[in-house]
A protein has these predicted regions:
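Mid-to-C-terminal alpha-helical segments outside catalytic/metal-binding sites
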Residues: 1-8, 19-38, 217-223, 232-280
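Acidic/histidine-rich helix-loop elements
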Residues: 9-22, 135-137, 196-198
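Divalent metal-dependent hydrolysis catalytic cores, especially in the metallo-beta-lactamase
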Residues: 25-48, 66-74, 96-97, 162
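Active-site-proximal loop/turn and secondary-structure-junction residues that shape catalytic pockets
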Residues: 45-46, 75, 102-104, 134-136, ...
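Active-site gating/metal-coordination segments in enzymes
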Residues: 48-144
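Catalytic pocket-lining loop regions of alpha/beta-barrel enzymes
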Residues: 93-97, 110-223, 276-279
Length: 280
C-alpha cells in the first residue's frame, strides 16, 4: 500500500479556478494512475476561492474512505469559534489532524494563541502538521518556518505528536536534530520540488534523506508525501525508487508510518505498494 500524507485541493497555482468537485476528481484520477491507496488532504490556512474550508472538503470526501482530511488553521484569525469548529470536526472523527502554516503567516509555533489547538490535538490524539522551510509564496517570511521552532512546542506539549513538513528544506540537519531528539516529532518528504525533480536535485535530496536515516533518525518517523498538485506524484515515486532503501524501510515510509500516526484503517488498492516494491 501507498499513502500520500500530504496533498491539497487548492488550485491557487492555476490560472483558471476549478471547483472543489473538479479538483477532487483530478486527485482521484492521479491516485488511480499512480496506484496510491490513500491520501490525506490538507486544507489551507485561509478560506477564499480556490481554497475550500475543512468542512467543505470533509463533506465532499465523506463517501471516499481512502481520502481523509487534515484541517488547516489560520493563526491570524484563530479564535474561540475556530476552536469550536475544530472540536466539532474532531468529535465527529471527520478530520485526522491539524495543520499550521508558519512562514505563510508571521508567527512561531510556540505562540500562546495556539495553545487551544495543541490541547485539542492532545485531547483527541491527532497529530499537528507544521509547515517548515521554503514557502511557495514569495511574500512568505521563512524565519518563522525554521524547523528548530518545532522543538519548543514538542517539549511543551509532550503528549502531542508533531510532523515537520518538507524535511525543513533547506534546513535538513536542523530537522534531523528535532526529529531525533523528540520522541513525539516526525517528518515528511513532501514539497521538496515543484513539478518534476531534476537529476542533480534528485541526487542531492537522496543524499539528504539517506544522511538523515544514517544520522540516527528512525525510518518509522519519516512519512511519504508529495505536496500534490504542486509536486508530481510520478516524480516522487521515481524518487522513492532511486533511494534504494531496504524493503522494510520502504514499507514504513510509504504506508505504515502514516497509517499509524493518523490512525487510518484502509483496504489496499490492488497493485499498490506490492507493485511499487517489485520495481526495486
Amino acid at each position: 500500500m501507498i499513502i500520500d500524507c500530504h496533498t491539497h485541493l487548492n488550485n491557487y497555482h492555476d490560472e483558471t479556478q476549478h471547483s472543489l468537485t473538479e479538483d477532487l476528481a483530478r486527485l482521484q484520477l492521479m491516485m488511480r494512475r499512480h496506484r496510491i491507496d490513500a491520501a490525506l488532504v490538507l486544507t489551507s490556512y485561509k478560506i477564499v476561492p480556490g481554497r475550500p474550508s475543512a468542512r467543505a472538503v470533509v463533506e465532499a470526501t465523506s463517501h471516499l474512505p481512502n481520502i481523509n482530511v487534515v484541517a488547516g488553521i489560520s493563526w491570524a484569525t484563530f479564535d474561540a469559534a475556530q476552536v469550536s469548529e475544530l472540536r466539532s470536526l474532531l468529535e465527529a472523527r471527520a478530520i485526522k489532524g491539524l495543520k499550521l502554516y508558519p512562514g505563510y503567516e508571521p508567527f512561531y509555533p510556540a505562540d500562546p494563541k495556539l495553545t487551544p489547538a495543541y490541547l485539542l490535538a492532545e485531547e483527541f490524539d491527532v497529530p499537528v502538521m507544521i509547515h517548515t522551510g521554503d514557502t511557495y509564496a514569495p511574500n512568505g517570511k521563512v524565519k518563522f518556518a525554521h524547523p528548530l521552532h518545532v522543538d519548543e512546542v514538542a517539549v511543551d506539549f509532550p503528549r502531542v505528536k508533531f510532523l515537520i513538513c518538507h524535511l525543513g528544506n533547506p534546513w535538513f540537519r536542523d530537522c534531523m536534530e528535532v526529529v531525533y531528539k523528540n520522541e513525539n516529532v516526525y517528518t515528511d518528504i513532501s514539497g521538496l520540488t515543484l513539478g518534476q525533480f531534476t537529476d542533480r536535485f534528485e541526487a542531492y535530496m537522496r543524499q539528504q534523506l539517506k544522511e538523515m536515516i544514517l544520522w540516527g533518525v528512525n525510518p518509522n518517523k519519516v512519512l511519504y508525501g508529495t505536496d500534490w498538485p504542486l509536486a508530481s506524484m510520478e516524480s516522487y515515486l521515481d524518487f522513492m525508487e532511486e533511494l534504494k532503501l531496504p524493503p522494510r524501510d520502504k514499507a514504513l515510509m510509504l504506508f505504515e508510518n502514516a497509517a499509524a500516526l493518523f490512525k487510518l484503517e484502509l483496504q489496499p488498492r490492488r497493485g499498490g505498494l506490492e507493485s511499487l516494491l517489485s520495481r526495486w
